[in-house]
From Swiss-Prot:
It comes from the Eukaryota. Belongs to the class VI-like SAM-binding methyltransferase superfamily. CHO2 family. It holds the Pfam family PEMT. This is Phosphatidylethanolamine N-methyltransferase. The gene is CHO2. Residues 1-55, 107-167, 221-231, 286-350, 394-417, 473-509 are lumenal. It catalyses: a 1,2-diacyl-sn-glycero-3-phosphoethanolamine + S-adenosyl-L-methionine = a 1,2-diacyl-sn-glycero-3-phospho-N-methylethanolamine + S-adenosyl-L-homocysteine + H(+). It is found in: Endoplasmic reticulum membrane. Catalyzes the first step of the methylation pathway of phosphatidylcholine biosynthesis, the SAM-dependent methylation of phosphatidylethanolamine (PE) to phosphatidylmonomethylethanolamine (PMME).
Length: 849
């Protein structure tokens, strides 16, 4: 594309001129011949500016334009509107094919073989000595393009061939534009437009929207030409090259291929103004032909000359995973046309296929109403979105989903594959229900007009294109949020900035729901489709805003840079004001959602140590820990072996000293161990069972010996006192804040309560350095608890209070991770196997951070 560079160049007068900022060019076949291209003018100035010299072909082009206008008027007056439409529609098709097919073929051969340039050289068209008729005409024609004092003989054949090629391009493009515009003018409902242009009704809104689209189209063309100049406008790099790279500025920073994409938005604006579906279909045909020209002519040439900005050249993470991992294959991806990466040996792929078939067959057999199907589609979208967002949120913050599978004996790759299956299944179900819902509305309800249905399908096509471009850029790994599950596989911690991400940071926010809003048009603005589209958009926005963006900051250490659209928008004052407004609204939403809807961090979510300390202090302040509930006597219930931090480590025996007045004592008094949070506010009566965690205080009680853990018992004239122990046979093996309660006789009436204390597992996080040390520590702990047999096996029957859940909590306390009880059972509670698995999980999770 046209840029300037500093170089030493040979000026047309043959003198050496150093360090002048000018665009330097050279023929494609030779980089040694350097020349300074003379000034050229755009198509409109060349044809209609009376101050510029006109060539013979330019005069012919102007004459044909005037002739077509006269023909249109005459045909409309004498042959009628329908015949005139046919005449100019036929002309438009001819000139459009001349453009996309004719010029396309010429440029294809010029790109590959320089056919036009070689033809000019072979027939010496620009040779000063050549005197044949064709040479004289060609030299006469392009001599008008040079300023006075300049000569075509000072420039290489490539340049002169391009100038001649431009004349024929001007002829085809101007006739293409003129015949299309005349066809549209004839199709306009002039009376309807004039009568409703000032009214706020459907016709008035449609007309003004169309006018805005046409004006936007004009701006796109003007801005595009100001960026690429005549050099790229007329495909100059098919003939010669300038010392410059591809330019991404202005409108080229906003949309991919703006000359071919939004550069034709005026077509659809004119279709809206006319309200004629025939005009719309003709516009779509012309636009599709233009895209074919882009795909098969221009894009291959750009990639050949400038290289591709695609990431295809780099081996994707998915390709590396397939090569390096024996049990990994690319995930199933449901596309608009079917399934991609279907693996006949993966059961999950068949589940997705069977689900789709079941939904379609079920709807065919049951034949639900449109409203019923809409309710199902809306409910399914809400439920599946909440599930997906929950998984992603918890995975981002704590690797929850991966940990879930690791705990059950699977690896992190399998966990990621299961997420891929869940995500694709949800997407497939949502889209198949949406398609069926649209079909049922089309069949059973009033469908929209040809125009609304067609525009709805165009929005659907935009979403399909957007999804295709996103997938092409980020591949399967990005499509399935791979950086949430396997961030350790990312070699370069750099966000994508190519493909569609060059223009928009989050294209799925806008174009990713275009097709969903297209169903609103297709279903004639059905309320159910409005609800579906709004719900879809809301969940899409919420996922990007509150889950994806914070996670990207964690993984890549930075937020996405300003997109091309944002950079271009902020060049203009109204753009800066608009962005400022959006930022303020965004901040207000953040403040509202996080201060009003999201609850503040509760005590239960705080740090465990700080949390428990605050609860203990609260209990100590709220009431005395030793209470006289019988009168004014002296009562005492103390824990002997508690440390200064109010902590006892499992499975240490706990010794409790007690004392009550003789009047309050009964031989069947007993002491129970309870979690503070479970006893509630009632301090006079214990309303929950002790679950076997209790002991009698007197050997003369009527209780069994299993619950007589008496160390000492005595009395005097005033008091009865003693001590008991809570050993591993009646101790709790669950961490928490506990208290002892002294109960009167064989009842749950509370006589006194000990001060609360923390019951915790021993802490070895800092001392355990390898798996062998963890195995030894675990076995030692289990021996102390009396549940280890054969020096390697955990026995569930040794202590009914020490369960598989207890062992799971031990690992979690020691290593911040654990395995499921189901996995433990599969290993027959082999401590070596279980502990090695825990260590492996810990290493995997640490590696994923």
């Amino acid at each position: 594309m046209a840029t300037s560079c500093e170089s030493t160049v040979l000026k047309p007068d043959g003198k050496l001129n150093s360090h002048v900022k000018i665009p330097i060019a050279h023929p494609r076949s030779s980089s040694t011949i350097r020349f300074d291209p003379p000034k050229t003018h755009d198509m409109v100035r060349s044809l209609f500016d009376p101050t510029l010299k006109k060539s013979f072909l330019e005069c012919c082009i102007t004459a044909t334009i005037i002739g077509n206008v006269i023909l249109c008027y005459y045909a409309y007056q004498h042959l009628g509107a329908n015949t005139t439409k046919i005449i100019f529609l036929s002309q438009y098709i001819f000139w459009r094919l001349s453009y996309n097919l004719g010029i396309g073929i010429v440029l294809h051969y010029q790109s590959h073989y320089e056919s036009l340039t070689n033809f000019a050289k072979k027939h010496t068209l620009f040779d000063k000595k050549a005197n044949n008729l064709l040479s004289r005409f060609v030299k006469f024609e392009i001599s008008a393009k040079y300023q006075k004092g300049d000569s075509l003989y000072r420039y290489p054949e490539e340049w002169n061939t391009w100038l001649l090629f431009r004349q024929f391009v001007d002829l085809i493009l101007m006739q293409d534009f003129t015949t299309y515009m005349l066809y549209v003018v004839i199709s306009l409902p002039h009376n309807d437009i004039l009568n409703n242009i000032t009214s706020f009704n459907s016709i008035g809104i449609r007309v003004w929207l169309g006018v805005l689209m046409v004006l936007f189209n004009i701006w796109v063309k003007i801005d595009a030409h100001s960026v690429v100049k005549d050099y790229a406008w007329y495909w100059g790099d098919f003939f010669f090259l300038q010392d410059a790279n591809l330019v991404f500025d202005g409108v080229f920073n906003v949309f991919p291929h703006p000359m071919y994409s939004i550069g034709y938005i005026g077509y659809y604006g004119l279709s809206l103004i006319s309200g004629d579906h025939h005009v719309l279909f003709v516009s779509i045909l012309g636009h599709c032909l233009q895209f074919l020209f882009l795909k098969y002519v221009e894009t291959p040439h750009i990639e050949r000359i400038y290289g591709s900005d695609s990431s295809d050249e780099e081996e994707s993470i998915d390709d590396k995973m397939v090569k390096q991992l024996d049990n990994y294959s690319k995930p199933l991806v449901t596309t608009f046309l079917g399934f991609k990466n279907f693996d006949k040996f993966k059961p999950t792929d068949y589940i997705t296929l069977i689900t789709v078939a079941s939904i379609v067959i079920g709807c065919t057999i049951l034949n639900p109403s449109f409203v019923t199907l809409s309710k199902i589609a809306l409910t399914t979208k809400i439920v599946s979105s909440v599930i997906n967002m929950t998984i992603l949120y918890k995975q981002s913050n704590s690797k929850w989903f991966t940990s879930l599978y690791l705990k059950n004996g699977y690896n992190e790759i399998y966990a990621y594959q299961m997420w891929q299956f869940i995500y694709n299944l949800h997407s497939t179900i949502n889209y198949i229900l949406l398609v069926l819902q649209c079909y049922y509305h089309f069949v059973k309800c009033d469908s929209g007009s040809y125009n609304t249905i067609t525009f709805g399908l165009l929005l659907l096509a935009i979403q399909i294109w957007c999804n295709t471009e996103i997938f092409h850029s980020i591949k399967e790994f990005g499509w399935f949020y791979g950086d949430f599950f396997l961030p350790n596989l990312i070699d370069k911690r750099k966000l994508k900035n190519d493909g569609i991400y060059r223009y928009l940071n989050n294209p799925e926010r806008v174009f990713g729901v275009a097709g969903i809003w297209g169903t609103v048009l297709i279903n004639n603005f059905s309320n159910w489709n409005l609800w579906l589209a709004t719900t879809w958009t809301m969940f899409n926005w919420f996922t990007v805003k509150f889950i994806e963006t914070p996670h990207l900051l964690k993984v890549y250490g930075t937020k996405p840079t300003s997109s091309g659209f944002e950079k271009t928008l902020t060049k203009y004052k109204f753009g800066k004001d608009f962005k400022s407004l959006i930022d303020k609204v965004d901040q207000l939403l953040d403040d509202y959602l996080f201060t009003s809807l999201v609850p503040k961090q509760s005590v239960a979510e705080a740090d465990r140590e700080g949390d428990w300390e605050s609860i203990i202090n609260m209990l100590l302040i709220r009431e005395q820990t030793v209470k006289n509930l019988q009168g004014t006597g002296h009562f005492n219930l103390d824990i002997v072996n508690i440390n200064d931090e109010n902590t006892i480590r499992i499975p240490e025996e706990i010794e409790i000293k007690w004392a009550v007045t003789n009047e309050a004592f009964h031989k069947d008094d007993w002491i129970g161990l309870y979690k503070v949070v479970e006893t509630g506010e009632d301090r006079l009566t214990t309303k929950i069972p002790s679950q076997g965690h209790w002991s009698a205080v007197s050997s003369s009680s009527s209780y069994s010996e299993d619950h007589q853990k008496i160390l000492h018992f005595d009395s005097n004239d005033h008091f009865t006192y003693g001590s008991i122990k809570f050993d591993k046979s009646i101790l709790c093996f669950e961490e928490g804040i506990y208290e002892f309660r002294y109960h009167s006789a064989n009842s749950h009436d509370v006589v006194m309560i000990s001060k609360p204390f923390k019951l915790l597992f021993p802490q070895f996080k800092e001392t355990v350095k390898d798996v062998d040390q963890l195995i030894a520590t675990t076995k030692q702990f289990l021996k102390q608890c009396g549940v280890l047999i054969n020096d390697n096996k955990f026995d569930l029957n040794r202590n009914k209070y020490f369960t598989g859940k207890t062992l799971q909590n031990w690992y979690k306390s020691t290593m911040d991770t654990d395995v499921s009880v189901v996995y433990m059972k599969r290993t027959n509670f082999d401590i070596d196997i279980i502990t090695k698995k825990v260590w492996q999980i810990k290493q995997v999770l640490d590696n994923l951070e």
